[in-house]
A protein has these predicted regions:
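N-terminal, Lys/Arg- and Ser/Thr-rich interaction peptides
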Residues: 1-38, 135
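Positively charged, aromatic-enriched nucleic acid-contacting surfaces
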Residues: 31, 36-136
Length: 136
């Protein structure tokens, strides 16, 4: 079977109504990562997800990026067939401000939001992110 094209993937996923699987917090809409993962597995069970990171001071590869000020971003990529999309997010507090030296729980929560947002780059729930890039 032929690998799906970006247009085919977008055509399938962008038509799915995610509205019953979102939650509003602090002025932003969040899509349930577990529900989003289930949809992706229903349609593309062979998708690949990877985390990018950097070497720490001991030479160990970490799946986060730590900036000189102590803030952290997570970066992931999702590949379906030959189509890859990437997304990144800073680890933030409830005010949507980057956290200095975040704990493992904050990093884990951000990773789940990051891959869910990466799914939006394929079409799943893309419309819930409209306007988040507009300055306040």
């Amino acid at each position: 079977m032929a690998k799906p094209t970006a247009k085919e993937i977008w055509g399938k996923l962008s038509k799915i109504d995610v509205s019953k699987h979102t939650e509003d917090r602090g002025g932003l809409t969040y899509l349930s990562w577990a529900w989003a993962w289930g949809i992706m597995m229903d349609h593309y069970p062979d998708l690949e997800m990877k985390w990018q990171g950097q070497l720490d001071e001991n030479g160990i590869m970490r799946d986060i990026n730590i900036y000189p000020d102590g803030t952290v971003t997570v970066n992931c990529s999702v590949t379906i067939g030959e189509v890859t999309r990437e997304m990144w997010l800073p680890v933030m507090d409830y005010r949507h401000q980057a956290i200095i030296s975040p704990d493992a729980r904050k990093i884990s929560d951000t990773k789940m939001r990051c891959f869910t947002k990466c799914f939006a780059m394929f079409g799943l729930g893309h419309y819930i992110y409209a306007g988040e890039d507009v300055p306040q």
